[in-house]
């Protein structure tokens, strides 16, 4: 199931004998599972913060070039959070305005079909590719680079090619297109040693 993918095939799910994680591993979870509830809440917290940022940044005295870059990074993060949500839960509320705890109408917003959520995701990510900097222009990890957006776009299209959207060949071709963008940038290399996958910074 989608939810069990969070901890699927991981010995770490048993390491600390965390019952809520064991429920996922054993496909024996319910709507009360704390791990899933926390993940859902944290992703929507990130989305709400992104919405607030986008609503208020325009009035900032920050340099316009930096504003454009920051907006691109935040729009990407918001789209990525929706990608994570829809990959795990399918239809989810596509909340694009900041909310308050007392705004019951916004808090009870109905789910949006997964197809529409994914359309929003790719539209946003493709739109911000030109707003963010390349990896060699950033001072170390921790920021959203052009190849970050391109690499995640490849993953999004791979997901769209299979369940539940089944876009097939067209989606897979777009996944290959964005993956080639990362490769052809020549800003990234594969780790020569498998263990370095777990020790090196991405």
Model-found features: residue ranges?
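Short coil/turn linking the two alpha-helices of tandem helical-hairpin repeats
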Residues: 86-87, 93, 159-168
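TPR/Sel1-like alpha-solenoid repeat signature
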Residues: 75, 150-156
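Conserved, well-structured interaction surfaces
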Residues: 15-89, 106-119, 125-141
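Short, small-residue-biased leader/transition segments that mark boundaries at the very start
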Residues: 2-7
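Extended ligand-binding clefts on enzyme/binding-domain cores
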Residues: 1, 184, 188-202
């Amino acid at each position: 199931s989608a939810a069990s993918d969070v901890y699927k095939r991981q010995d770490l799910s048993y390491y600390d004998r965390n019952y809520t994680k064991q429920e996922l591993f054993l496909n024996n979870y319910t709507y009360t599972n704390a791990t899933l509830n926390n993940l859902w809440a944290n992703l929507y917290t990130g989305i709400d913060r992104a919405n607030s940022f986008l609503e208020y940044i325009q009035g900032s005295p920050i340099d316009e070039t930096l504003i454009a870059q920051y907006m691109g990074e935040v729009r990407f993060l918001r789209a990525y959070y929706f990608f994570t949500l829809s990959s795990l839960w399918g239809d989810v509320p596509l909340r694009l305005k900041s909310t308050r705890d007392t705004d019951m109408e916004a808090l009870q917003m109905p789910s949006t079909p997964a197809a529409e959520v994914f359309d929003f995701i790719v539209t946003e990510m493709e739109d911000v590719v030109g707003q963010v900097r390349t990896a060699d222009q950033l001072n170390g990890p921790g920021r959203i680079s052009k190849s970050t957006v391109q690499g995640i776009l490849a993953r999004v299209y791979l997901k769209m090619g299979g369940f539940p959207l089944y876009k097939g060949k067209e989606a897979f071709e777009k996944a290959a297109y964005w993956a080639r963008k990362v490769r052809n940038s020549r800003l990234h290399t594969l780790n020569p040693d498998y263990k370095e996958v777990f020790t090196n910074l991405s």
